[in-house]
Structure formats: C-alpha cells, structure tokens
Amino acid sequence: MFVGEIMPMGFGVHYVGSEGVAINPFYDILWMIIFVVIIAVIIYILISPLKKQSSSIDNEKLIKIEKDVEEIKEIVKELKKKWEEIE
C-alpha cells in the first residue's frame, strides 16, 4: 500500500489561501527578502560592538604611543644635555 493510494497527490502541499497561484511566487520572494534583511540586521547588530571596541583599542594605542613619544623626547633632551656637558 503506497501513500499515493491513500491520499491524492499534493494533498499535504495545499495551503490555506494559496488559491491565488499567480501572486504566490511574489510573496515567496518578498518573504525571502524580508528574511535575508532580518538576518543581515541581526548580524550587523552583533558585529557593531566589535567595531566600537576595536576603535577604542586603537585610541588607547594611540594615546600610549603619544606618551611614549613624549618620554622619548625627554630622554633625548637629557642625553643631549649630558653630551653637551661631556664636550
């Protein structure tokens, strides 16, 4: 006994409100686009904090580099003074 003998073909495929077959593919594409947009928005929301963290890390690195440069300038000035004293 096969399933086709018990139920006619396509019995489980019929959806309520699917009588307008010409309009149905449009809604399928529309729902697919909406689904893709929702997924893209979720991914963007999940990734955006990572971008903010990386920019703050970059700012912290720049501040540290600026401090290091100032320290190096002071060391160079001190070495220059000592060199002048030696001469």
Swiss-Prot record:
Q: What is its main location?
A: membrane
Which superkingdom?
Archaea
Query: What is one term from the GO cellular component aspect held by the record?
Result: membrane
Transmembrane stretches, by residue range?
Answer: 29-49
Q: Which UniProt keywords apply?
A: Membrane, Transmembrane, Transmembrane helix
Cell location: Membrane
Regarding the membrane, this protein is recorded as:
Single-pass membrane protein
Stated name of the protein: Uncharacterized protein MJ0230
Query: In which organism is this protein found?
Result: Methanocaldococcus jannaschii (strain ATCC 43067 / DSM 2661 / JAL-1 / JCM 10045 / NBRC 100440) (Methanococcus jannaschii)
